[in-house]
A protein has these predicted regions:
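Bacterial c-di-GMP phosphodiesterase EAL domain
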Residues: 1-96
Length: 96
């Protein structure tokens, strides 16, 4: 949709990290990388409100590329992080 394309172009997509807590106290902390969108007023739009539209309008590859790019930048500055990123099936099936 136009709203999603605008958010990508205007850099209103963000990558948030949610800790994945280990069952044992020792060990490495892992994080799930989650995409969030800010609307034109700066309010957070949760994925349930925009991911279906992104799938329907063919924007998931752009969102996934954003998430991967941001995650790689983050890992470049914080190599000790361990990240999990959810990607769409369409992105994984698309050969480039």
């Amino acid at each position: 949709s136009i709203r999603i394309k605008d958010a990508l172009r205007e850099r209103r997509m963000e990558l948030w990290l949610q800790p994945i807590l280990p069952l044992r106290a020792e060990g490495r902390t892992y994080f799930e990388a989650l995409v969030r969108l800010r609307d034109a007023d700066g309010k957070i739009v949760m994925p349930g409100q925009f991911l279906s539209a992104a799938e329907n309008f063919g924007n998931m590859q752009q969102i996934d590329q954003f998430a991967l790019y941001e995650a790689m930048n983050l890992l470049g500055t914080h190599p000790q992080l361990a990240l999990s990123i959810n990607l769409s099936a369409r992105t994984l099936n698309h050969a480039q």
